Amino acid sequence: MAKSWGETTGGSNDKIEFLKFNNGITRVRIVSGVLPRYVYWLTNKEGSVAPFECLRFNRDKESFVRGKADPVHELGFFEKELDKDGNRVPLKPKKNYIAFVIDRSDNKLKVMEVKATILKGIQSIMKQLNLATPFDIDISIEKKGKGFDTEYDVQQIAAMQFQIKLQDPNSAESKQYAADVDLIGEAMCDEDGDIIKFEKVPSLEQTYPVPTYEEQKEAIQAFMEGRENKDDDAKSGNSNAGSQKGIDQEAASDLDD
């Protein structure tokens, strides 16, 4: 299940885009919990890159299950670099925690990769502002550099300033949040008044179901042979995430280990 923002350690949804971080400031409103997962990035003969969820990773416990069957390893995918003894190393999965957000550049619902530094930054803001969730503030994230030198900075002062402006019912921020209801629906709260979810925001678990071993193996083989079909996203663990398959190499390379 999707984890709440405090506890994790680390509309129509027919087409859900992945948020692309460009150098500079990206501003988002988070509208879901965070879904823990690890993925393998595979490249087929046509040069296309696609993520396949690591079936050895337990989402709920946020840990790897030793000895669990893994079609990526069985099919013989390896790292490009050899180990210090000159031996081939089985391909390693990359952390790919995700959450639904509203991208303020176009006010569309998208999926954001919650990188380790972003997660820590958001949790720090929640602590500073005494928030149970980050749903009631916009988050500004600054990206610097590229590739393995990429850095992400969650701007705490901007979040504090936004929270103050949101208290004014006549502010642009308050009017934007009122308009967000058309996209995400009403907030659904628990008995303490804390937001659990938004009415129209789809379930991360249902959007990104964990495939069976057989389903994923077939999806990998189809992708590598260039014969993937419309069902392969679900079998790989990336239902409705076709746009992620076109993710650029830089975005893939700066994922967390």
Swiss-Prot record:
GO biological process, alphabetically ordered: DNA replication; viral DNA genome replication
Region (Disordered): 222-257
Gene Ontology MF annotations: DNA binding
Alphabetically ordered keywords of this record: DNA replication, DNA-binding, Early protein, Viral DNA replication
Role summary: Required during DNA replication. Displaced viral DNA strands are transiently coated with the ssDNA-binding protein. It is then probably removed by the replisome that performs lagging strand synthesis or during the events that lead up to the recombination process.
Induction and repression of expression: Expressed in the early phase of the viral replicative cycle.
Compositional bias (Basic and acidic residues): 225-235
Protein name per UniProt: Probable ssDNA-binding protein
Gene name linked to the record: D11
